[in-house]
């Protein structure tokens, strides 16, 4: 009788743990409520004008849609100094407002970013060795404009190596649109475009920026660079999430 009771309790506990895990996965697709924050009222136009006067930006035009982008050299790399705005299937306007695209760019799923079939949101590209090797080419383009490509973790890390270790991304964040203004020391001009879950929830607009890496992380995840008002990190997220894209120039 005692043994049966122990077995019963063990089964119940296992069910509770599994249910909690499933619930946790569901909740991870919802935006957590946050307390209201004091806003930084520095106008976007003032930030942009200051940067245009301070930094030696290059520029190029994407032949696909006529969009023109600023570029900036940081160390030995040349980066787009704006988020990609190219409208493709599997891309979304930040906070679900098309009026945000001009400033914040668009949000893309990982497979859209890499310009590969959507089935790879849930499975590794290793099942197709030709695609697996193609993506790992140094200058694999993906959805980037011609002459640019989706950065790898190594390229993101090379960019971050230029930062003060204690800056927590402040040197990359713009002076506008963040609660805690960045110093934007390199003219990279990161704006908090937020992100989108695959269930349609748009999250953290005005509070967070996330950028894709082309590198896979497990079977259904990929790496991303994330900046908040006080942190910066590279971690894995669901490939079905929609994030911003910054492209780096081919070498």
Predicted feature residues:
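Hydrophobic membrane-insertion alpha-helices, especially the h-region
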Residues: 12-19
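Hydrophobic single-pass membrane-insertion segments
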Residues: 23-32
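Conserved positions within compact, well-structured domain cores
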Residues: 37-251
């Amino acid at each position: 009788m005692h043994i049966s009771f122990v077995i019963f309790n063990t089964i119940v506990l296992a069910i509770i743990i599994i249910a909690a895990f499933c619930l946790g996965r569901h909740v991870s697709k919802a935006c957590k409520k946050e307390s209201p924050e004091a806003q930084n009222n520095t106008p976007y136009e003032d930030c942009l004008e200051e940067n245009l006067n301070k930094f030696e930006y290059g520029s190029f035009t994407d032949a696909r849609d006529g969009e023109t982008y600023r570029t900036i050299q940081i160390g030995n790399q040349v980066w787009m100094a704006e988020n990609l705005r190219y409208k493709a299937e599997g891309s979304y306007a930040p906070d679900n407002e098309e009026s945000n695209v001009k400033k914040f760019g668009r949000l893309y799923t990982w497979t859209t970013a890499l310009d590969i079939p959507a089935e790879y949101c849930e499975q590794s590209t290793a099942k197709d060795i030709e695609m697996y090797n193609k993506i790992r080419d140094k200058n694999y383009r993906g959805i980037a404009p011609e002459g640019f490509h989706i950065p790898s973790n190594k390229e993101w890390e090379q960019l971050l190596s230029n930062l003060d270790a204690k800056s927590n991304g402040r040197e990359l964040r713009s002076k506008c649109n963040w609660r805690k203004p960045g110093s934007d020391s390199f003219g990279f001009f990161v704006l908090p475009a937020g992100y989108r879950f695959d269930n349609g929830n748009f999250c953290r607009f005005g509070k967070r920026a996330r950028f894709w890496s082309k590198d896979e992380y497990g079977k259904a995840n990929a790496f991303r660079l994330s900046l908040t008002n006080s942190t910066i990190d590279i971690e894995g997220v669901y490939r079905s999430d929609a994030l911003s894209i910054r492209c780096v120039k081919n070498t």
